[in-house]
């Protein structure tokens, strides 16, 4: 391929489970008393280093070329890093570089004819899962707190919930 990835699909007896929503790659975190999981799309193994490569598939349909530059796509990057962390937590050696296989539907060709074509772009991403452990600690602390924390003014989800509460407050 034009991405020149020196890897082949990884074969593992749990691969189908790893891809299944609500099952996925699981890590029993005995230190915190939690089961963390995430459903991956694909895993490759590098032919030289033998490190695993996480591949995540994305699909969209837009006129512009796909990339990972939008602010909201930090969620995609965090998702990739979490998958890398899960696999490492299960004892696998995982490459920091993962791949997004981004499919962009060509609906702007002015013809449909019962089929849809895609442009496929391979986007490398060098993950860094250093944020995960401290985030899990904060998450556990929040869950165990007696007092609910104040909404974060920079959190779009918090803003959304506040608007719902205002709209339904009688």
Task: List the predicted regions and their residue ranges.
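Mg2+/Mn2+-dependent nuclease catalytic core
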Residues: 20-134
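Short functional micro-motifs and their immediate structural scaffolds
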Residues: 163
């Amino acid at each position: 391929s034009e991405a020149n990835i020196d890897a082949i699909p990884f074969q593992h007896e749990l691969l189908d489970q790893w891809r299944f929503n609500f099952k996925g790659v699981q890590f029993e975190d005995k230190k915190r008393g939690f089961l963390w999981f995430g459903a991956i799309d694909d895993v490759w193994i590098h032919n030289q280093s033998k490190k695993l490569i996480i591949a995540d598939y994305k699909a969209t349909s837009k006129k512009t070329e796909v990339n990972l530059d939008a602010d909201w796509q930090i969620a995609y990057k965090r998702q990739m890093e979490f998958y890398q962390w899960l696999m490492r937590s299960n004892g696998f050696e995982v490459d920091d570089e993962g791949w997004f296989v981004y499919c962009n539907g060509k609906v702007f060709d002015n013809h449909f004819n019962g089929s849809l074509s895609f442009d496929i772009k391979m986007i490398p991403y060098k993950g860094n899962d250093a944020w995960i452990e401290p985030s899990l600690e904060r998450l556990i602390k929040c869950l165990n707190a007696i007092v609910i924390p104040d909404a974060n003014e920079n959190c779009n989800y918090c803003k959304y919930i506040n608007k719902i509460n205002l709209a339904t407050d009688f």
